[in-house]
Design a protein with these regions (language model features):
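Acidic (Asp/Glu)-rich catalytic clusters
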Residues: 106-113, 131-148, 216
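Short histidine/acidic/glycine/proline-rich micro-motifs that form metal-
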Residues: 122-126, 189-192
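Charged helix-capping and loop-helix junction motifs
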Residues: 129-136, 163-168
């Protein structure tokens, strides 16, 4: 416990004092998580797994630093209409729709009454390994935003034109029909996009889209918004270092 307290103290100074609301066009960090669970020994991409204990410490650190998690919709509204954001806004996003995003992440954020952003691969709404629709509805009721991550998670830069329409517009339509929410934002699978993909995302009615490019999200690039990937190897110190480095 003393070691945890010392680590928290060591990374406690991050940003200077700021007003209670951010003005229009402020860059905002968007965190990117995948699985909130220990990595199995045979996992091919171990850094996609963040230990639940690390996730709890990271969220506690955000709270101590007075960050205020918001949805991507609130960020978009600030950038486009000037709707105020809270002090130190941050978006906490989760890709694909893993079960642990409900059993671990949702329940942790619920303690703080914080929203998350769930980028759902529609075919991942299944009994084994993914989210069930009833769990997604509980997340929505707690203020979470649901966004589209295609139907089957392909590399969109290499699919045919008809399939591109199905994966992009079809995923939005499926989520809107099932959950009765707007689904205004898109997340590119594996961060893969090109001009053709962006054009289809716009055509499907999305307001903006997130990538896997590293950095703060900025309003000039609404359809290529940067995010901050949180890896299993980051721990608390690496997590804080990423946010501290981008704040400079």
């Amino acid at each position: 416990m003393l070691r945890v307290a010392a680590t928290l103290a060591a990374v406690s100074v991050l940003l200077p004092a700021a007003p209670h609301a951010f003005i229009r066009k402020t860059p905002v960090p968007i965190l990117m998580y995948h699985v909130i669970a220990p990595a199995p020994a045979i996992a091919p991409y171990r850094d996609l797994y963040v230990k639940p204990s690390d996730f709890v410490l990271q969220m506690r650190w955000l709270k101590r630093q007075r960050f205020h998690p918001v949805t991507l919709q609130r960020v978009y509204d600030n950038w486009t209409t000037g709707t105020p954001l809270p002090f130190r806004p941050i978006v906490i996003s989760f890709d694909d729709g893993y079960l642990s995003q409900y059993t671990r992440a949702y329940k942790t954020l619920l303690r703080y009454r914080w929203p998350g952003v769930e980028n759902i691969e529609v075919n991942f709404l299944q009994p084994f390994g993914g989210l069930r629709p009833w769990r997604v509805r509980k997340m929505i009721a707690a203020g979470w935003e649901i966004d589209a991550h295609t139907l089957t998670h392909p590399d969109l830069t290499h699919v045919s034109a008809p399939r591109l329409v199905r994966e992009v517009a079809g995923s939005r339509a499926a989520l809107r029909h099932r959950f009765h929410v707007p689904v205004n934002f898109f997340c590119y699978p594996s961060g893969r996009y090109d001009a053709r993909v962006i054009a289809e995302v716009r055509r499907a009615g999305f307001l903006a889209a997130t990538t896997t490019n590293y950095g703060l999200a900025r309003p000039p690039g609404l359809f290529t918004l940067d995010r901050i990937r949180i890896n299993g190897s980051d721990g608390l110190a690496g997590f804080a270092s990423k946010l501290q480095g981008l704040a400079r």
